[in-house]
Amino acid sequence: MIHPSAKIHPTALIEEGAVIGEDVFIGPFCIIEGTVEIKARTVLKSHVVVRGDTVIGEDNEIYQFTSIGEVNQDLKYKGEATKTIIGNSNKIREHVTIHRGTIQGCGVTAIGNNNLLMINVHVAHDCQIKNNCILANNATLAGHVELDDFVIVGGMSAIHQFVIVGAHVMLGGGSMVSQDVPPYVMAQGNHARPFGVNLEGLKRRGFDKPTMHVIRNIYKMLYRSGKTLEEVLPEIEQIAETDSAISFFVEFFKRSTRGIIR
């Protein structure tokens, strides 16, 4: 079903059964195949391919030669029914690839709202990107990677399968990330190592000085106290009882399975 207000270029190919919403623009040579839904006011510039069981939300801007919902590169994948879901108000630049999920994972590759994926970004099967993230040119996420809110991934960086990157993390360009990155941390290198707290990012997002002071103290507990993670966690949990900003740490460590960067 194509909404009457949608604008479809005559060279675009749209498979019967696709749902195209109000004021959607689909430019030259785009291909829409499968049970695709594209919601209101989303723009596909040109030469965009959307396949499979894919939902793209409202007010997204998707640039030329991007591929969304394509068969993933997991050799175990045998055509099972899996999904790709993209939220609202994302900017997805040229040559980005976003692959559908697998049944061995959560079955869904998901991107939230207000994210920027720059040129040549790859988002592999079962990745979960939350909101307000920036992935710079040529950043690569392997399968099952999770990015929490406000993560910045520098250009030419690569993140290993199953890694979790906590909220407000900044990864410098060219980083190779093979372990989980705690919230609020700046990291860079091959392999990525922590280099302090992302204070500039926190200031821009309205964190007050007392909260940033507590976050810095937790960073010191994790990386400069000489204590093991098991020794530090009860102290962090105690602080989190009275400071909601610190609850990010507690929730992160409950999910972490690969150990944290050191």
UniProtKB/Swiss-Prot annotation:
<dbReference type="GO" id="GO:0009245">
    <property type="term" value="P:lipid A biosynthetic process"/>
</dbReference>
<dbReference type="Pfam" id="PF00132">
    <property type="entry name" value="Hexapep"/>
</dbReference>
<dbReference type="InterPro" id="IPR001451">
    <property type="entry name" value="Hexapep"/>
</dbReference>
<comment type="pathway">
    <text>Glycolipid biosynthesis; lipid IV(A) biosynthesis; lipid IV(A) from (3R)-3-hydroxytetradecanoyl-[acyl-carrier-protein] and UDP-N-acetyl-alpha-D-glucosamine: step 1/6.</text>
</comment>
<dbReference type="GO" id="GO:0016020">
    <property type="term" value="C:membrane"/>
</dbReference>
<dbReference type="InterPro" id="IPR029098">
    <property type="entry name" value="Acetyltransf_C"/>
</dbReference>
<comment type="subunit">
    <text>Homotrimer.</text>
</comment>
<keyword id="KW-0444">Lipid biosynthesis</keyword>
<keyword id="KW-0677">Repeat</keyword>
<dbReference type="GO" id="GO:0005737">
    <property type="term" value="C:cytoplasm"/>
</dbReference>
<protein>
    <recommendedName>
        <fullName>Acyl-[acyl-carrier-protein]--UDP-N-acetylglucosamine O-acyltransferase</fullName>
        <ecNumber>2.3.1.129</ecNumber>
    </recommendedName>
</protein>
<dbReference type="InterPro" id="IPR011004">
    <property type="entry name" value="Trimer_LpxA-like_sf"/>
</dbReference>
<dbReference type="InterPro" id="IPR037157">
    <property type="entry name" value="Acetyltransf_C_sf"/>
</dbReference>
<keyword id="KW-0441">Lipid A biosynthesis</keyword>
<dbReference type="Pfam" id="PF13720">
    <property type="entry name" value="Acetyltransf_11"/>
</dbReference>
<dbReference type="GO" id="GO:0008780">
    <property type="term" value="F:acyl-[acyl-carrier-protein]-UDP-N-acetylglucosamine O-acyltransferase activity"/>
</dbReference>
<keyword id="KW-0012">Acyltransferase</keyword>
<dbReference type="InterPro" id="IPR018357">
    <property type="entry name" value="Hexapep_transf_CS"/>
</dbReference>
<keyword id="KW-0963">Cytoplasm</keyword>
<keyword id="KW-0443">Lipid metabolism</keyword>
<dbReference type="InterPro" id="IPR010137">
    <property type="entry name" value="Lipid_A_LpxA"/>
</dbReference>
<comment type="function">
    <text>Involved in the biosynthesis of lipid A, a phosphorylated glycolipid that anchors the lipopolysaccharide to the outer membrane of the cell.</text>
</comment>
<keyword id="KW-0808">Transferase</keyword>
<comment type="similarity">
    <text>Belongs to the transferase hexapeptide repeat family. LpxA subfamily.</text>
</comment>
